[in-house]
Amino acid sequence: MTLYDKEINKNSLLIPMVIEKTSYGERSYDIYSRLLKERIIFLTGTIDDNTANLIVAQMLFLEAENAKQDIYIYINSPGGVITAGMSIYDTMKFIKPNVNTICIGQACSMAALILTAGKKGYRYCLPNSRIMIHQPIGGYNGQASDIEIHAKEIIKVKRKLNELMAFHTSQSINTIEKDTERDCFLSANQAIKYGLIDTILSYRT
């Protein structure tokens, strides 16, 4: 068993279980599986390929279950790998159900793009959440010609991300480029004014 496996096993012990009584007896679910029945998906922690694959699989499953019912993604993430985040983004746009996004805690970097990519009018934030947008971070070691190739690629990626952010927020490309030159933190109220979200949720109605 590797240290990684031990860490997974340790974390799995912390996941609450829910017991439901049915006509066939009792059935137990981990809390995330139970919430998935309510079409709720959690995007938490760093966005990597493994996390993205799980989120994508859950969205595809919920679409297969009911293509007309909304999906809810709760986000508390510092961001992560661009390609992993884009796989989530593209799947949100690919599937038929509307995807509602809710920021709880923080939505930074790629997580901010996923948050603002939710269905227009159904992008939410809790009152004390924060959102951070910035330009992509990259680093590469190797031959000069390879470094040049990767530098050109990250510039193209930056341009694409800025275009998507501008589309979803209705901000100009110039504004997005200026604001993402450095880490740009926004409160829930600032995020509404910026166009990243639509509503702050203080309590259930």
From Swiss-Prot:
<dbReference type="InterPro" id="IPR023562">
    <property type="entry name" value="ClpP/TepA"/>
</dbReference>
<keyword id="KW-0645">Protease</keyword>
<dbReference type="GO" id="GO:0004252">
    <property type="term" value="F:serine-type endopeptidase activity"/>
</dbReference>
<dbReference type="Pfam" id="PF00574">
    <property type="entry name" value="CLP_protease"/>
</dbReference>
<keyword id="KW-0963">Cytoplasm</keyword>
<feature type="active site" description="Nucleophile">
    <location>
        <position position="109"/>
    </location>
</feature>
<keyword id="KW-0720">Serine protease</keyword>
<dbReference type="GO" id="GO:0009368">
    <property type="term" value="C:endopeptidase Clp complex"/>
</dbReference>
<dbReference type="InterPro" id="IPR001907">
    <property type="entry name" value="ClpP"/>
</dbReference>
<dbReference type="InterPro" id="IPR018215">
    <property type="entry name" value="ClpP_Ser_AS"/>
</dbReference>
<keyword id="KW-0378">Hydrolase</keyword>
<feature type="active site">
    <location>
        <position position="134"/>
    </location>
</feature>
<comment type="similarity">
    <text>Belongs to the peptidase S14 family.</text>
</comment>
<dbReference type="GO" id="GO:0005737">
    <property type="term" value="C:cytoplasm"/>
</dbReference>
<dbReference type="InterPro" id="IPR029045">
    <property type="entry name" value="ClpP/crotonase-like_dom_sf"/>
</dbReference>
<dbReference type="GO" id="GO:0051117">
    <property type="term" value="F:ATPase binding"/>
</dbReference>
<dbReference type="GO" id="GO:0004176">
    <property type="term" value="F:ATP-dependent peptidase activity"/>
</dbReference>
<comment type="function">
    <text>Cleaves peptides in various proteins in a process that requires ATP hydrolysis. Has a chymotrypsin-like activity. Plays a major role in the degradation of misfolded proteins.</text>
</comment>
<comment type="subunit">
    <text>Fourteen ClpP subunits assemble into 2 heptameric rings which stack back to back to give a disk-like structure with a central cavity, resembling the structure of eukaryotic proteasomes.</text>
</comment>
<dbReference type="GO" id="GO:0006515">
    <property type="term" value="P:protein quality control for misfolded or incompletely synthesized proteins"/>
</dbReference>
<protein>
    <recommendedName>
        <fullName>ATP-dependent Clp protease proteolytic subunit</fullName>
        <ecNumber>3.4.21.92</ecNumber>
    </recommendedName>
</protein>
<dbReference type="InterPro" id="IPR033135">
    <property type="entry name" value="ClpP_His_AS"/>
</dbReference>
